[in-house]
Amino acid sequence: MSAQLINGKEVSQKHLQAIAEAVAQRQQDNLHTPCLAVVLVGGDPAGAVYVRNKKTACQKCGIKSLSYELPESTSQEELLALVDRLNADSEVDGILVQLPLPKHLDSQAILERISPDKDVDGFHPYNVGRLAVKMPLMRPCTPKGVMTLLEAYGIDPKGKKAVVVGASNIVGRPQALELLLARATVTVCHSATENLADEVAAADILVVGVGIPNFVKGGWIKPGAVVIDVGINRLDDGSLCGDVEFETAKERAAMITPVPGGVGPMTIATLMENTLHAASLHDA
């Protein structure tokens, strides 16, 4: 029997609608309109698509968006100066620097320059640290989006064996913290993990984010597991696929996210949610 598909597009639309209603209510209450500043450096086509999607989501929610498209040659000092200006601008609630940045730029230094209360991506060490000590402020968008999806489908991680494959700062590490916060028993797998197939086979909830097409084989999946595929990879024929071998995995899993249409839309919905939250922090 095929797994139930977890429809991130549908869940994200409901969340965007709720955010739009909250923004409209703010305007009725004479509170300022939330504002997101997005910075794109260079002409990376994928980055440009992501930025366009974020602008579209802002329009749907009634959130003001500012766009800064800088040339590939932008220096570290120039980018830091822009971040400083946006930090100081009281009209800007959220700042997002689109990754990856050109190789000559120090991404970590730039992310750390963003004020934690404007860090709507949730990448600042302060925000990751708050999540680690069970006091989240700005939660990383993709991991929080995954938790929202689980909640929407009535999946409670409490007491479940959750396995995260991938230990990146953007997905794997904060995802493990989110699952731990939800009281799952969490295992994180990475490039030094031995017997990966055995670890995957033990998972009640499996979250995979490694950026390698079809990396996790469908036959490894525990029957009845919930599979969340964060990966999105473009194959030579132009088609998109995730990090999990979808066709075989869906015959074993109880629920699974498709790629595209699973986690991706939730990342953007959570970004809008974080921008609204940042605006509420700045009301005082």
Curated annotation (Swiss-Prot):
CDD domains: NAD_bind_m-THF_DH_Cyclohyd
GO biological process: L-histidine biosynthetic process; methionine biosynthetic process; purine nucleotide biosynthetic process; tetrahydrofolate interconversion
Protein's pathway: One-carbon metabolism; tetrahydrofolate interconversion
Sequence positions that bind NADP(+): 166-168, 191, 232
Catalytic activity: (6R)-5,10-methylene-5,6,7,8-tetrahydrofolate + NADP(+) = (6R)-5,10-methenyltetrahydrofolate + NADPH; (6R)-5,10-methenyltetrahydrofolate + H2O = (6R)-10-formyltetrahydrofolate + H(+)
Classification via Gene3D superfamilies: Leucine Dehydrogenase, chain A, domain 1, NAD(P)-binding Rossmann-like Domain
Keyword Hydrolase found: yes
One GO term describing the cellular component: cytosol
Entries under SUPFAM superfamilies matching the protein: Aminoacid dehydrogenase-like, N-terminal domain, NAD(P)-binding Rossmann-fold domains
The EC number(s) this enzyme carries: 1.5.1.5, 3.5.4.9
Coiled coil residues, start to end: none
GO terms, molecular function: methenyltetrahydrofolate cyclohydrolase activity; methylenetetrahydrofolate dehydrogenase (NADP+) activity
Keywords: Amino-acid biosynthesis, Histidine biosynthesis, Hydrolase, Methionine biosynthesis, Multifunctional enzyme, NADP, One-carbon metabolism, Oxidoreductase, Purine biosynthesis
InterPro entries according to UniProt: Aminoacid_DH-like_N_sf (IPR046346), NAD(P)-bd_dom_sf (IPR036291), THF_DH/CycHdrlase (IPR000672), THF_DH/CycHdrlase_cat_dom (IPR020630), THF_DH/CycHdrlase_CS (IPR020867), THF_DH/CycHdrlase_NAD-bd_dom (IPR020631)
Function, in words: Catalyzes the oxidation of 5,10-methylenetetrahydrofolate to 5,10-methenyltetrahydrofolate and then the hydrolysis of 5,10-methenyltetrahydrofolate to 10-formyltetrahydrofolate.
Family statement drawn from the similarity comment of this UniProt entry: Belongs to the tetrahydrofolate dehydrogenase/cyclohydrolase family.
Subunit structure: Homodimer.
Name of the protein: Bifunctional protein FolD
UniProt source species: Neisseria gonorrhoeae (strain ATCC 700825 / FA 1090)
